From Swiss-Prot:
This is DNA primase. One of its GO terms (cellular component) is DNA-directed RNA polymerase complex. GO terms for biological process: DNA replication, synthesis of primer. Its EC number is 2.7.7.101. The gene is dnaG. It comes from Chlamydia trachomatis serovar D (strain ATCC VR-885 / DSM 19411 / UW-3/Cx). GO terms for molecular function: DNA binding; DNA-directed RNA polymerase activity; zinc ion binding. RNA polymerase that catalyzes the synthesis of short RNA molecules used as primers for DNA polymerase during DNA replication. The lineage of its organism: Bacteria, Pseudomonadati, Chlamydiota, Chlamydiia, Chlamydiales. Mg(2+) 2 binds at D302, D304. InterPro entries: DNA_primase_core_N_sf, DNA_primase_DnaG, DNA_primase_Znf_CHC2, DnaG_bac, DNAG_N, DnaG_primase, TOPRIM_DnaG_bac, TOPRIM_dom. HAMAP family: DNA_primase_DnaG. Its cofactor is Zn(2+); Mg(2+).
Amino acid sequence: MYYTEESLETLKHSIDIVSVLGEYVHLKRSGADYKACCPFHDEKTPSFIVYPTRGHYHCYGCGEHGDAINFLMKQQGYSFSEAVLFLAKKFHVDLVVRTKETSGQDSKDSLRRINREAERFFQYCLLHLPEGEEALAYLYKRGFSPDTIDRFQIGYAPEQRLFIQAMEERNISVKQLEWAGYLAKDWFLFAQRIMFPIQDALGYTIGFSSRRFKEGGRGGKYINSPETILFKKSRVLYGLQFSRKRIAKERRVILVEGQADCLQMIDFGFNCTLAAQGTSFTETHVHELVKLGVSKAYLLFDGDAAGEKASLRVGDLCQAAGITAIVCRLPSGQDPDSFLMQRGPEELRELLDRGEDYLSFLVWHKIHSYEQFTPREKARVIEEVIQQVRCWGSPITIHEYLRQLASLVKVPEPAVLSYLSSITSAAEDKGKKVSAKEPSSESKQTSTEGKISKKISPRMILEADVIRCLLFAKPEDEFVPATVKQYLSPEEFHCAEYRAIFVMAMNHYNDRQTLPSMDEMMSLVVGTEAMTLLVARRMNTELMRDIVVQSIQKLLDKHWRDKKRKLCHQTGKGLDSLQEYVRLSGERVKVSLVS
């Protein structure tokens, strides 16, 4: 959306940049200005300067600069509109949308106003109406203090007649209430329920979650607002408005199942806690965590079978998205709320610290699903776990997980790696059978080049030795890439994956005089037989120069012999021309020069 220049100027003149940046950076006064260590790069001596009179910041170390809007976009990942809305709310500035976009924006603004008025009315009913006393007593019994109730703006929805009357007094019609999701076929969805506002990351109320606190009444235990133009359940992370700053700073999150659990966790100081809204955690929710910069997720789900099942599912989603999942198991029958009430925050911190990595939890769960863990069951567990692990990030990461798996199930690492190779080969065979009847023109064109033999050939081992040198070469040592570049070309690599790594490495080296990262190169072989061969053997980096010379020598020797054998086969009588002999002899001489 686009705002008028006048309203944006009003906002910019209203912003106190020190109060905004001070929430994220430890500022120290330096004369008329402020300084700090830059949040955008590592440094020990402050070079990040904030100029209050100009409403501007500048880092003289990395060059980052801008105003409060730029800072929020960079530091918090806000879009321009989100940053503007956040600041407008903080400094009480009314923004005006440009005329051509006013219609759609008016709808959102109208819905925000209805939600705001409803939220205020529900709070009033909880604290000041006789009907709210029972709900208030229930909240106190559950451990919600007056400060907690006020902080999270918890309220109580009375019966339908009072609600409609109160809204009409605020110029909100029944038709508008139906549009906003409060009424459905003349039924007030939230009548006589405790109301928990659902807010977006900027603090605007976009919907409600209601809880039945006594027997009777229509609907289930929880009723949530239906989806609207503001409220999309699959994208909402409950508690984000209270946890976003801490999550951005620490890049970790605690995930719980319910809103009450989330609020109690935050109230006890665990200000990086989130819950899903109206549904279980989905891939979309995990994608939102990735956008927030989360690198580690603590799964604190209920201590029952459903909670264990949720940990298995959400943990796999996190791992596949590159987020390290830590499973924290609560005692049987407890949830985070009850655990806090009974044992306190210190014991919960200890429980979080004792959390186990997701792979260990996954293996434990699968092992304990069998009455007897025989060798046959062990093989089945390894295969099932590998099917999940092979989707968890970069090839190097996958290899480390497979090493851990081997340790957990007490089998040699090569055995686990061979399982990965066999699973990958089986998947490839299945895909070939499906498409065998109607091969595409593209497959016909490429069918004769770059195939990896299902039985690893001696030549493939030699090619892998050279590629392994590129993978493990020290960044400061140019001998390895320079030597490989001097003596080898794509022609020497028959394995398509190794040839692709060679081309990537040489192009990168030609452009920047450095090699690509190991992850970049390994991404070309993930899940293939070629990867299995690369990670199956260790590399002595202290002898790297000798190894690369020997590896190139052996590969070129093999290449020369293969070409000679092929020529003999084609002519049926060996070398039949002096020209061919001289050419091959020249290549053989080139090989000798490496020694």
